Structure formats: C-alpha cells, structure tokens
Amino acid sequence: MGQKINPLGFRLGTTQDHHSLWFSQPKNYSESLQEDKKIRDFINNYVKKNMRKASGAEGIARISIQKRIDLIQVVIFMGFPKFLIETRPQGIEELQRTLQKEFNCGNQKLNITITRIEKPYGNPNILAEFIAVQLKNRVSFRKAIKKAIELAEQADTKGIQVQIAGRIDGKEIARVEWIREGRVPRQTIRANLDYSSYPVRTIYGVLGIKIWIFID
C-alpha cells in the first residue's frame, strides 16, 4: 500500500517554512503548541464572525506565529483584508485586546499585523474556501472545481489538482472525484508545491476538499 505523507511536511526546509517559530523547554513544549492552536482557532473564528457578508469566506491563507521572551508576533496572511477592515476599522486593535485578555500572555506583549498576499487565488486555502462556499450554495461540484481551476490559472500557477470526497451532490454512496490541470509533481521534493485540506459541512454531510498547487 502506498503511504501518503502531508505534502507540506514532506518539503519542510526545502520549499516550505514552519508557520510557528519559537524555542521552548521540553516540559513546556506541549503547552506552547496548544497555545498556537488556540490562537489560530480564535483568529479564524473572529474573522469568520466579522468578515463582510458579501465576501462569503475568510480569505486567510495562513497565520504565522513568532514568540520571543517579551513578544508574541502574529502575522495574518489574507487574500482580501479590505473585507475585514471595511466592516470593522478598529478590528485589529479589538482582536489584539481580546486575544491578550483571553490567553493571559503575562509579560509577553501581543502584536498582530495583517499582510495581503499578492495573488489570493494562487493559494490553496483560499481556493478551498471558494469551493466550499460554492458547494454550500448547492452549485454542482464539477462547475465549482472548474471555476476554481480557472481562478488558479489566472494567478499564474503551473498546475493544480482538486479532489473532493464524500456524498457528492447528495448521492447515497460516498465517492472521490478529482480533476488535474497542468503539472503537479507530488513526489519531487524540490518542487514548490502548496497544499490544503479543507472540510466543508453541507446539508448531505461532510465533504473533504484537497487542493495541490504547483507554483514553480
């Protein structure tokens, strides 16, 4: 049987970087790791709640966390930050205050910044969110995938593979459907490949969306 490895973990140190950067004593390591998870979940929930309704998705590509002795630096990479900023101009300060209070950071100052990514639809997380919104609105899965591939091609990607698994279009038997365009070298470590796995809850049950994007 073929063993499937996470494409991002497979390329750490070559084309992928860690999303959390800090040192910790072995006894405190698990606590720090859980804190990172909670910070990411909290930010995702906050953005989901306060994003402009018309946008339909959060548009978060990734959240990077760096910890020093006196500072926790959180960078939110977003495709469409204006949707959040238009709704709540003071949103970042409010998020920072709430997060500081929630996690009781002690001596560490919390600093949050938002960075806009150049080509949002060249990012698999944002693309997966786009497909998820389409599926929730009962758009045909094939139509949703084709539109996502078009958007990815406009973002100058060299190849993309989209896979959806579950009770597609409400069918009784779960199945896996996938479409690939261009080159997607999943076994080449040197290949700059980005990946996202995204669950979406529809009226028929949970569907799993996986996207591989070959950048260069």
UniProtKB/Swiss-Prot annotation:
Main location: plastid
Superkingdom to which the source organism belongs: Eukaryota
Keyword check for Cell membrane: no
Molecular function terms from GO: rRNA binding; structural constituent of ribosome
Location(s), subcellular: Plastid
A Pfam family recorded for this sequence: Ribosomal_S3_C
Signal peptide, first to last residue: none
GO biological process: translation
Keywords of the record: Plastid, Ribonucleoprotein, Ribosomal protein, RNA-binding, rRNA-binding
Transmembrane segments: none
SUPFAM superfamilies linked to this entry: Prokaryotic type KH domain (KH-domain type II) (SSF54814), Ribosomal protein S3 C-terminal domain (SSF54821)
GO cellular component terms listed in the entry, alphabetical order: cytosolic small ribosomal subunit; plastid
The keyword Cell membrane is annotated on this UniProt entry: no
Domain spans labelled KH type-2: 43-118
PANTHER family given in the database record: 30S/40S RIBOSOMAL PROTEIN S3 (PTHR11760), SMALL RIBOSOMAL SUBUNIT PROTEIN US3C (PTHR11760:SF19)
Family: Belongs to the universal ribosomal protein uS3 family.
Quaternary structure and partners: Part of the 30S ribosomal subunit.
HAMAP family in alphabetical order: Ribosomal_uS3_B
Name of this chain's protein: Small ribosomal subunit protein uS3c
